[in-house]
Curated annotation (Swiss-Prot):
Coiled-coil regions, chain positions: none
Entry function: This molybdenum-iron protein is part of the nitrogenase complex that catalyzes the key enzymatic reactions in nitrogen fixation.
Xref: InterPro entries: Nase/OxRdtase_comp1 (IPR000510), Nase_comp1_asu (IPR010143), Nase_comp1_CS (IPR000318), Nase_Mo-Fe_asu (IPR005972)
Binding positions ([8Fe-7S] cluster): 70, 96, 162
GO BP of this protein: nitrogen fixation
Domain of life assignment: Bacteria
Gene name as annotated: nifD
UniProt keyword list: ATP-binding, Iron, Iron-sulfur, Metal-binding, Molybdenum, Nitrogen fixation, Nucleotide-binding, Oxidoreductase
GO cellular component: molybdenum-iron nitrogenase complex
Species in which this protein is naturally found: Leptolyngbya boryana (Plectonema boryanum)
Source species taxonomy: Bacteria, Bacillati, Cyanobacteriota, Cyanophyceae, Leptolyngbyales
Cofactor(s) demanded: [8Fe-7S] cluster; [7Fe-Mo-9S-C-homocitryl] cluster
NCBIfam families attached to this UniProt entry: N2-ase-Ialpha (TIGR01862), nifD (TIGR01282)
Protein name listed in UniProt: Nitrogenase molybdenum-iron protein alpha chain
């Protein structure tokens, strides 16, 4: 991807620091053993290289303030939680569920507590006696009670927390027995937080649970002729869009405008029937590659359904993705894609004309989760902004390979960056904007640095699609050009 031409990294005073020297300086604070481990996760991208040159998906250094989550967070908080018509039990002590309760803005349509349950919290509230004697009976009773209290639920998932795996409870046996009793899907998910090195394994475990406990229902429905969708040649599924602030809805609008039929959304505003119906589609459109590539690959291998990673951040990338998607179908869809791109051109030109003069040349440092350290970059470029640093909380090597298509030579790369490292990088690079998560938000705002939260859009959005780009541009302008910042001084400038 080509960044804006108006300002080069060398010309921008904010990036006068040599990033290679900066890495060395920051690592000096560590003991030798820790320094050797962390230096493998930090690098400066060299154009033409096949990847970003960092190690990833490795256990965090003990004692470092990592921003990562756990496997439970990846399964319950990301993949399963947004399935709106299922009840998701946080099986274990109350804290894990309580502190992750409704933390992501997964918008959905429905009546909460009647036929949808996305913002509700259900827990087995493990106590000491449950650790000693086991919690299988308690879990079975909980499922029975939930069925009585919320009869319109379409299924239940059991999101196991650390103690469940440590004491060896058999949640699979409970799930099988309970499913027969209530005649609905009961899905056990072995997502205990101690598994793996981050929330990324939780995504994988959640994907495997869909494969093992939901898709057999698909196969049976196909065999019995009871599947409740009449396939067409234009059927697609949106995979890995969690509808943060309505993002999936914005994406769906564009896909339907070019003539495609969206059969399923995974998993923002999604239902269990949509999961079951997905293996009937002609193409899976993957938004968050990191969290959903596993099930997409499985469907390709098992059902012959191809998949494509798309990006609807910023008009340049939207047009590119629409054309790539349309190329998988016939000339009718391809022609409609061009019509849709042309339809929104005037709107796009108006947004850029308004905000480009106010944002051009501004620098941004990113540090987010699954896909946004690369996917949001084109939207910044479309506004004339510059990326000087980016990194993933829980990225894998293939994420960093994909990132090379979005960044330019000299970009600072940081994997699983610690709180200390990130603060030191920002102090020296002095970007105009920091775009990261809620844990970082107030640290940098107290430094008088403009900040936008890239996990939940700072309670704004949607940011996907052409309409979302207008909101994105407005929000970046609000953050950078608010008069607030002229009234506050950074600690290092005193």
């Amino acid at each position: 991807m080509t960044p804006p031409e108006s300002v080069t990294l060398e010309e921008n005073a904010a990036t006068a620091v040599d990033p290679k020297e900066l890495i060395k300086d920051v690592l000096e604070a560590y003991p030798e053993k820790g320094r050797k481990k962390r230096e493998k996760h930090l690098n400066v991208y060299q154009e033409g290289k096949p990847d970003c040159g960092v190690k990833s998906n490795i256990k965090s250094l003990p004692g470092s303030m990592t921003t990562r989550g756990c496997a439970y967070a990846g399964s319950k908080g990301v993949v399963w939680g947004p399935i709106k018509d299922m009840i998701h039990i946080s099986h274990g002590p109350v804290g894990c569920g309580y502190y992750s309760w409704s933390g992501r803005r997964n918008y959905y349509i429905g009546t909460t507590g009647i036929d949808t349950f996305g913002t509700m919290q259900f827990t087995s509230d493990f106590q000491e006696r449950d650790i000693v004697f086991g919690g299988d009976k308690k879990l079975a009773k909980l499922i029975t009670e939930l069925e009585e209290l919320f009869p319109l639920n379409r299924g239940i998932s059991i999101q196991s927390e650390c103690p469940i795996g440590l004491i060896g409870d058999d949640i699979e046996a409970v799930a099988k027995k309970s499913a027969k009793e209530i005649n609905k899907a009961v899905v056990p998910v072995r997502c205990e937080g101690f598994r793996g090195v981050s929330q990324s394994l939780g995504h994988h475990i959640a994907n495997d649970a869909v494969r093992d406990w939901i898709f057999p229902r698909t196969d049976k429905a196909k065999k019995d002729g009871t599947i409740d969708v009449d396939p067409t040649q234009y059927d697609v599924a949106i995979i890995g869009d969690y509808n943060i602030g309505g993002d999936a809805w914005s994406s769906r609008i564009l896909l339907e405008e070019i003539g495609l039929r969206v059969v399923a959304q995974w998993s923002g505003d999604g239902t269990i029937n949509e999961l079951i119906n997905t293996p009937t589609v002609k193409l899976n459109l993957v938004h968050c590659y990191r969290s959903m590539n596993y099930i997409s690959r499985h469907m390709e291998e098992t059902y012959g359904i191809p998949w494509l990673e798309y990006n609807f951040f910023g008009p340049t990338q939207i047009a590119k993705s629409l054309r790539e998607i349309a190329a998988k179908f016939d000339e009718t869809i391809q022609a409609k894609a061009e019509e849709v791109i042309a339809k929104y051109q005037a709107q796009t030109d108006e947004v850029i004309a308004k905000f480009l003069p106010r944002l051009q040349g501004k620098t941004v440092a990113l540090m987010v989760g699954g896909l946004r350290p690369r996917h949001v970059v084109p939207a910044f470029y479309d506004l004339g902004m510059r990326l000087i640093g980016t990194g993933y909380e829980f990225g894998h090597n293939d994420d960093y390979k994909r990132t090379t298509h979005y960044i330019e030579d000299g970009t600072l790369i940081y994997d699983d960056v610690s709180a200390f490292e990130f603060e030191e990088f920002i102090k020296e690079m002095k970007p105009d904007l920091v775009a990261s998560g809620i844990k970082e938000k107030y640290v940098f705002q107290k430094m008088a640095l403009p900040f936008r939260q890239m996990h939940s859009w700072d309670y704004s959005g949607p940011y996907h699609g052409y309409d979302g780009f207008a909101i994105f541009a407005r929000d970046m302008d609000m953050a950078l050009n608010s008069p607030t910042w002229s009234l506050i001084g950074a600690p290092w400038s005193k």
